[in-house]
Structures are given as structure tokens and as C-alpha cells.
């Protein structure tokens, strides 16, 4: 039995033996909750969008969540967000030093970039594929009065153009708003194919063709995508100067092997000074979310 509280919204995760019991528990311990949803499917798509069933209260989907002296606005049905990673995000306040240049692909609504930028004098660029997450990511940078250059892009394509990708003069904000307004069917998109068809029609004609390729280098790259993030290790190794923080999922007995596989791939492309890993949360029985820290020469 597990659930998350995101602002005024509670989300229950299956399997659940007694829904009424957990709903009553939430209402007893979280008086401010106005809506309780059951997540009805796994986050299997690239956008990690949940399908939700309202169990109690008002059908509100947009909420405001606070952590680490930051505030985040989001729609729980349009973006992936985990309050369970609050402590993990806080750790980067100590890991990151002032004046670092940081890239964060798979940034969602910008929780990692904003928590870091709120506490450190840094230059951050974030990349996210989901236009809803980009929309809220830009809103959240303004709410928190921090400067995070937030880009709508597929990191697998955008890394080649990274030096020339900016939300300069609100160009990304404009594109995101146009995309969401012009393609209301995105409300129902849950498969990669449908989304990529829409995004490619728009993105390739509106942005990429107007840019020239250009590589940019970053002191630190943080990749908060545990499912499939390792597939982008090449791009990260090309762009990183010093540090890469990569997330993955692994069973208790497979953690060491998972880390070794990723490090073996990375060491073929770059010389590694040191690496370590940390378990940052559980996702099931003896299954964990891990962060792999790679220190480059």
C-alpha cells in the first residue's frame, strides 16, 4: 500500500487490497487533500504520463507542491513528478559548487534544476521532451525566481545542437504554447508513436531546421531518467567535463552488475577517474532506484 501527496492531491499506487481503508487514512492524516486518485496503469511511455481514476473529492488535476524552499506548479495527469525524490534532490545542493555549468536532460517540470539554482550560483540548461512538463518547468523557474534555460527537445537529437538551443526571448515558451494549443489531441497521447509524429511535425519544422549544429560542454550532467537513461550515456560523455550522475532501476541482486555494465560502456569512450553508486529509493520488493556517479578525467 503506497501513495504520494502532491500539494492538495493524493495518488494511490496499485496493488491495493482495501481502497476505502487507504482513502480514509489519507483523509485522516492529510486534512488539506482535496482530491484522491488511483493510478490505473504503469508509466510505460516515453512521457511517463499516468492514467488516473478519481476516488474522492474534486476533479482537480493542477496543484502546487513545496520542497527544499522551492515551489512547483504542475498537472498530475500531464507530467511525471515524484515527491519521494525530495531528499535526493536536496543532496545536489551539497554536491554542486558555485559557478558550475550544468545540463539536466529529462528534467520534467524542473525540480532538479530549480532546487540547485535556488541554492547555488550556477548556469543550468534543462531539456525535456514532454511539452506539458516544459510549460510548467518554465512557469516554475519564474515562480522560484531562478534562471534555468528550459528547452523542449529530444535529448537524443538535441545534444548536437545544444550550444544553439535557448529559450531566448521566450522562443521555447512560444513554441510550447503553440504546440499545446494546436494539438489538443496530446491530451490523449499515451504512446510514443503518436507523440513523436506530432512533435516531429512541429519541432523539426519550427526549431531544428533554423539552427546550426553546435556542441557545448558542461561541468556536470544530471540525468534523472531511471528507465532507459543509460541509453544516452554516449551523449552525456561527449558533453560532460567532470561529472555525470545517471539513474537506473535494478533488483537487489543485480545492482553491482548494472553499475558494472554502465561503467564498462562509459570507460570505452572516456577515461574514468572514479565512480560510485547510491541507492536512493525502492520501487518494489528488493527493487531499487540507484544513482551512479561518474567522475571523469
From Swiss-Prot:
S-adenosyl-L-methionine binds at residues 89, 106, 128-129. Keywords: Cytoplasm, Methyltransferase, S-adenosyl-L-methionine, Transferase, tRNA processing. It holds the Pfam family TRM5-TYW2_MTfase. It catalyses: guanosine(37) in tRNA + S-adenosyl-L-methionine = N(1)-methylguanosine(37) in tRNA + S-adenosyl-L-homocysteine + H(+); 4-demethylwyosine(37) in tRNA(Phe) + S-adenosyl-L-methionine = isowyosine(37) in tRNA(Phe) + S-adenosyl-L-homocysteine + H(+). InterPro entries: MeTrfase_TRM5/TYW2, SAM-dependent_MTases_sf, TRM5-TYW2-like_MTfase. One of its GO terms (molecular function) is tRNA (guanine(37)-N1)-methyltransferase activity. The keyword Transferase applies. Its main location: cytoplasm. GO terms for cellular component: cytoplasm. Its EC number is 2.1.1.-, 2.1.1.228. It is an enzyme of class 2 (transferase). Belongs to the class I-like SAM-binding methyltransferase superfamily. TRM5/TYW2 family. PANTHER family: TRNA (GUANINE(37)-N1)-METHYLTRANSFERASE, TRNA METHYLTRANSFERASE. This is tRNA (guanine(37)-N(1))/4-demethylwyosine(37)-methyltransferase Taw22. The lineage of its organism: Archaea, Nanobdellota, Candidatus Nanoarchaeia, Nanoarchaeales, Nanoarchaeaceae.
Amino acid at each position: 500500500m503506497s501513495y504520494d501527496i502532491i500539494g492538495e492531491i493524493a495518488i494511490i499506487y496499485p496493488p491495493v487490497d482495501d481502497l476505502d481503508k487507504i482513502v480514509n487514512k489519507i483523509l485522516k492524516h492529510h486534512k488539506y487533500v482535496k482530491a484522491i486518485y488511483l493510478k490505473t496503469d504503469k508509466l510505460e511511455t516515453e512521457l511517463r504520463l499516468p492514467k488516473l481514476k478519481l476516488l474522492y473529492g474534486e476533479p482537480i488535476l493542477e496543484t502546487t507542491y513545496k520542497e527544499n524552499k522551492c515551489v512547483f506548479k504542475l498537472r498530475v495527469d500531464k507530467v511525471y513528478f515524484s515527491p519521494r525524490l525530495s531528499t535526493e534532490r536536496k543532496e545536489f545542493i551539497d554536491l554542486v559548487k558555485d559557478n558550475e555549468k550544468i545540463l539536466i536532460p529529462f528534467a520534467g517540470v524542473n525540480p532538479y534544476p530549480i532546487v540547485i539554482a535556488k541554492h547555488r550560483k550556477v548556469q543550468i540548461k534543462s531539456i525535456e521532451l514532454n511539452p506539458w512538463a516544459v510549460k510548467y518547468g518554465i512557469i516554475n523557474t519564474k515562480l522560484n525566481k531562478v534562471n534555468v534555460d528550459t528547452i523542449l527537445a529530444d535529448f537524443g537529437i538535441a545534444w548536437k545542437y545544444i550550444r544553439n538551443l535557448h529559450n531566448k526571448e521566450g522562443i521555447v515558451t512560444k513554441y510550447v504554447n503553440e504546440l499545446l494549443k494546436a494539438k489538443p489531441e496530446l491530451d490523449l497521447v499515451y504512446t510514443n508513436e503518436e507523440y513523436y509524429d506530432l512533435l516531429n511535425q512541429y519541432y523539426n519544422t519550427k526549431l531544428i531546421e533554423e539552427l546550426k549544429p553546435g556542441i557545448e560542454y558542461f561541468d556536470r550532467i544530471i540525468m534523472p531518467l531511471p528507465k532507459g537513461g543509460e541509453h544516452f550515456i554516449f551523449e552525456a560523455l561527449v558533453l560532460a567535463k567532470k561529472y555525470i550522475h545517471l539513474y537506473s532501476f535494478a533488483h537487489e541482486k543485480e545492482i553491482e552488475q548494472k553499475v558494472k555494465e554502465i561503467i564498462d560502456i562509459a570507460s570505452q569512450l572516456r577515461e574514468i577517474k572514479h565512480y560510485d553508486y547510491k541507492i536512493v529509493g525502492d520501487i518494489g520488493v528488493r527493487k531499487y532506484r540507484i544513482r551512479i556517479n561518474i567522475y571523469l578525467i
